[in-house]
């Protein structure tokens, strides 16, 4: 568990599953999905089926909840793109619109990046977003990340093409960036 004032990121507990299911699956077209890879279908999962995945969610090192003042507002985590070369990517979703543009995502990502570079022999941490999610691009810029790739017009959503964006931070950039201290 890590804390930055009222914001906490911590492993998912079994007691969190009902709230997480509600945030992710209770609505057919949730507002958050308009920003989190909306070009991929959001498939409804019943609560019973969601509970069948609890072993992959509860107390895992790679997927945590984000809390503000004790309220779960999102999830954050990482996945291996290519483990033999220590290449991982991070992901975040703030499910509750009331918490968008409040700096919570930036702070949570900063905490996770610190955790990853401190506990793993990584040379790079990155994430992929799309040009329709300008807030996520700005988060990376605020954290000193580099736009490493812009794959033009490869994401299609609501009748428009968007770019896929890759942001990355190298260990030496993390070490020299005072906001990570």
Describe these PLM feature segments.
Residues 54-59, 145:
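Short loop/turn motifs at secondary-structure junctions and domain boundaries
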Residues 17-21, 35-36:
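Short, charged low-complexity linear motifs
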Residues 1-19, 26-27, 63, 67-181:
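Acyl-donor (CoA/ACP) binding surface of acyl/acetyltransferases
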Residues 21, 51-54, 113:
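A generic alpha-helix structural signal
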Residues 29-52:
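Conserved GNAT-fold acetyl-CoA-binding loop/helix
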């Amino acid at each position: 568990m890590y804390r930055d004032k009222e914001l906490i990121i911590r492993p998912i507990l079994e007691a969190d599953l009902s709230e997480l299911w509600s945030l992710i699956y209770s609505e057919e077209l949730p507002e958050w999905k308009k920003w989190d890879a909306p070009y991929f279908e959001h498939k409804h999962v019943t609560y019973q089926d969601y509970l069948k995945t609890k072993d992959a969610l509860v107390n895992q090192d790679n997927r945590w909840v984000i809390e503000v003042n004790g309220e779960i507002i999102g999830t954050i985590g990482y996945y291996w793109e290519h483990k033999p070369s220590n290449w991982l990517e991070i992901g975040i979703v703030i499910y509750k619109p009331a918490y968008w543009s409040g700096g919570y995502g930036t702070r949570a990502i900063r905490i996770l990046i610190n955790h990853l570079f401190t506990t793993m022999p990584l040379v790079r941490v990155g994430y992929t977003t799309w040009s329709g999610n300008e807030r996520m691009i700005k988060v990376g810029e605020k954290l000193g990340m580099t736009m490493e790739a812009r794959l033009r017009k490869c994401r299609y959503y609501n009748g428009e093409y968007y770019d896929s964006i890759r942001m990355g931070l190298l260990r030496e950039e993390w070490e020299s960036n005072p906001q990570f201290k």
